[in-house]
């Protein structure tokens, strides 16, 4: 297997991976986190960013519109986007001076393929599982079972403005009892946290 990596020795390529069942809001979360990163970068750089240190990789080939939507949002944010690499990720040129945001397919098998690929030692990957806060508690165990291939991940609760604090607290307790960290809460307008720096 070949990797085309433009990197210094001992550097790892930073990757943020977003997983979740169909309709969980994972792509929405990805772009909100990316926007936070861009705004933070511009604040520290006096509003200038010659080349964005970020890139979006879309593995979402299940829906024909998903890649196009991803490209359009990236154009609006002035961030490079590569869609359609789901079959040949090993042939892509990854750079250690960039951080990659990975949008995954809705199919669990495809998500596992992406996770396995970016679990290799040349990558420093951080995984986030988008979980709708409106979901029934009895279904959460099944979702965790589906994503048992994720060895180290954090949860982002989505659709928080479509439920109440009691339900959110119940879901939070569910994850806390399993020692799974909730990284952020997402609603229609904002996300209440930012990704930890790799």
Regions found by a protein language model. Give the residues of each.
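Short beta-strand-centered segment that lines the nucleotide-binding/catalytic pocket of NTP-utilizing
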Residues: 19, 41-66, 85
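The conserved Walker
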Residues: 22
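Conserved glycine(s) of the Walker
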Residues: 25
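Switch II (G3) loop of P-loop NTPases
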Residues: 58-61, 65, 76-86, 98-114
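Hydrophobic positions on the alpha1 helix immediately C-terminal to the Walker A/P-loop
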Residues: 29, 33, 69
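Extreme N-terminal, non-catalytic leader segments
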Residues: 1-13
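Inter-motif core of Ras-like GTPase G domains
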Residues: 112-135
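Canonical P-loop GTPase G-domain recognition
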Residues: 161-198
């Amino acid at each position: 297997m070949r990797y085309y990596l433009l990197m210094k020795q001992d550097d790892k390529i930073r990757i943020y991976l977003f997983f979740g069942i169909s309709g969980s809001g994972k792509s929405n979360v990805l772009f909100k986190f990316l926007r936070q990163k861009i705004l933070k970068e511009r604040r520290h750089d006096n509003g200038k960013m010659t080349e964005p240190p970020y890139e979006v990789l879309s593995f979402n080939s299940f829906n024909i519109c998903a890649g196009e939507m991803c490209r359009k949002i990236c154009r609006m944010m002035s961030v490079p986007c590569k869609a359609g690499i789901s079959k040949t990720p090993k042939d892509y040129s990854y750079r250690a001076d960039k951080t990659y945001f990975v949008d995954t397919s809705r199919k669990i098998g495809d998500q596992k393929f992406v996770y396995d690929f970016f679990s290799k030692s040349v990558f420093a990957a951080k995984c986030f599982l988008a979980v709708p806060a409106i979901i029934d508690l009895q279904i959460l165990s099944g979702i965790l079972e589906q994503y048992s291939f994720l060895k180290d991940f954090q949860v982002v609760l989505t659709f928080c403005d479509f439920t109440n604090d009691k339900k959110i607290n119940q879901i939070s307790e569910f994850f806390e009892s399993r020692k799974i960290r909730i990284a952020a809460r997402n609603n229609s307008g904002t996300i209440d946290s930012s990704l930890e720096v790799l």
